[in-house]
Amino acid sequence: MLSSPLRVAVVCVSNINRSMEAHSILRRKGLSVRSFGTESHVRLPGRRPNHPVVYDFATTYKEMYNDLLRKDRECYTHNGILHILGRNERIKPGPERFQECTEFFDVIFTCEERVYDTVVEDLCSREQQTFQPVHVINMDIKDTLEGAILGAFLICEICQCLQQSDDMEDSLEELLLQMEEKAGKSFLHTVCFY
């Protein structure tokens, strides 16, 4: 069993759906978790396809919720966005960008390949300070309510297995292979250093 709690980050594009669903589940399981997005702005589905509602990352979940409630309560209730923002508000005040975080993690999960690329690029561009390893794992998670829940449970299972292992470095590769087989999809994995 690991001597200290596993420090986990989950990163998606806007820190709204996939990363926050995982944040919610991991937190309920008692894990040390933070969640982030990587884009320059938060984009939510709008009333029409290809016309997202765009917010700055400094906008709180409550402000987004109230804005969408005023704009079209029925639409944003029907598509689940108000539910998601309500859940998010109970977890933390607002979305955060990974590139602005200075905290160190043991494992960072990303929810799609372009987010993985951004996270790895950001970590590699930072000046190394402690040479502490951080495992960056990508699992493509569909950006739907159901996809986010399924992805969050898979991330949770991996974290619980890692938390129980005697040596995370030795057991991670084998664990990822087992989880890939179970999930029916492959993961990207690399190690970066702080």
From Swiss-Prot:
The name this protein goes by in its record: RNA polymerase II subunit A C-terminal domain phosphatase SSU72 like protein 6
Superkingdom, natural source: Eukaryota
Reaction equations catalysed: O-phospho-L-seryl-[protein] + H2O = L-seryl-[protein] + phosphate; O-phospho-L-threonyl-[protein] + H2O = L-threonyl-[protein] + phosphate
Coiled-coil features, chain-numbered ranges: none
MF-aspect GO terms: RNA polymerase II CTD heptapeptide repeat phosphatase activity
Recorded name of the encoding gene: SSU72L6
EC number(s) stated in the UniProt entry for this protein: 3.1.3.16
Job of this protein: Protein phosphatase that catalyzes the dephosphorylation of the C-terminal domain of RNA polymerase II. Plays a role in RNA processing and termination.
Entry GO terms, CC: mRNA cleavage and polyadenylation specificity factor complex
Taxon lineage: Eukaryota, Metazoa, Chordata, Craniata, Vertebrata
Family: Belongs to the SSU72 phosphatase family.
